[in-house]
Amino acid sequence: MASGHSLLLENAQQVVLVCARGERFLARDALRSLAVLEGASLVVGKDGFIKAIGPADVIQRQFSGETFEEIIDCSGKCILPGLVDAHTHPVWAGERVHEFAMKLAGATYMEIHQAGGGIHFTVERTRQATEEELFRSLQQRLQCMMRAGTTLVECKSGYGLDLETELKMLRVIERARRELDIGISATYCGAHSVPKGKTATEAADDIINNHLPKLKELGRNGEIHVDNIDVFCEKGVFDLDSTRRILQRGKDIGLQINFHGDELHPMKAAELGAELGAQAISHLEEVSDEGIVAMATARCSAILLPTTAYMLRLKQPRARKMLDEGVIVALGSDFNPNAYCFSMPMVMHLACVNMRMSMPEALAAATINAAYALGKSHTHGSLEVGKQGDLIIINSSRWEHLIYQFGGHHELIEYVIAKGKLIYKT
């Protein structure tokens, strides 16, 4: 006889819903306390979506006599939403471990970049790599992220800069989206740097006249699926005018605006993003007060990256100011050759210690608000009936242990489940 349901998680000490009323994001006072059930159970259907959540005795009576493909006893454990990593660069070839010593000796990001390192070093090796090589390395990286509790991840291109390599990277991301268990939001980031031999204006023209029309064609044919458009809006890279042109053209072909802004210098990127209706802006270490207010008013998410500020010794993003002004704050790992971090629990820990976020704020930023930043908070980011069955089970009676613990999360996170399917078990 066929099973009636996919999964029963029973008798959890805590089930952290995050949201309980269908909120698409949490801001201001809503972040003070997250929705948590004590002594609860959860049911995921065969379609991969959550069917029921409630007190353990109520769920037991409601589903008495029903069959399940798998039952997990969660006594003494906590169930949380699968984590959402809102900003990564996971497709590339060419390790840059040698640059870490340069950073420790005091070299800045732009000094390394201008010396032929940084992005350009990775671009050369990514152009040389085969599609299969890039896929295998991406697969390994995404598996590391899944083991750390991530079930939805944003994946950027951006280490090609020419059309051929950018499309190669996007095909690799598309293959991962189709073949792997982790959820993926794909981002075209061809404006990650200005290619050698071109000016920023020439690079912007190439993207607008050649790259984006090709993306539109391939998307219409169903060959690749791209969700977002990104530009590195920065002094010495793409200025505000070039950024505006590229983002607007991307929006015109149906892409969500989700870009790098106000990282190393104040560029008024936040104000631009709010004006263009951006879904999210990342970094924001140098954002202005006016930009913060504009983002809050426009409901444009701020994706903060505490790993980057930590590794590059930048000043911390003003998370508290953003939270107090009502900005929708999300978190990302910024995984890339320059910030080699797979772990959203580590990101949350750094956000609490270095950016003075509370643990509820950090968890919301790594779940519902990160999902909002990717335009997916209607299906991801909280444990609610009708949402996708993406969740993690930790071997602790308090959910805060996920953030409190500094490292070693592969032992704390006992199960990772995506679309109701067990994808990792310690």
Curated annotation (Swiss-Prot):
Name of the protein in its database record: Probable imidazolonepropionase
Cofactors: Zn(2+); Fe(3+)
NCBIfam families per record: hutI
Enzyme class at the top of the EC tree: hydrolase
Domain of life according to the entry: Eukaryota
Pathway annotation: Amino-acid degradation; L-histidine degradation into L-glutamate; N-formimidoyl-L-glutamate from L-histidine: step 3/3
EC number: 3.5.2.7
Binding site for Zn(2+): 260, 334
Catalytic activity: 4-imidazolone-5-propanoate + H2O = N-formimidoyl-L-glutamate
InterPro entries the UniProt entry points to: Amidohydro-rel, HutI, Metal-dep_hydrolase_composite, Metal_Hydrolase
GO biological process: L-histidine catabolic process; L-histidine catabolic process to glutamate and formamide; L-histidine catabolic process to glutamate and formate
Lineage: Eukaryota, Metazoa, Chordata, Craniata, Vertebrata
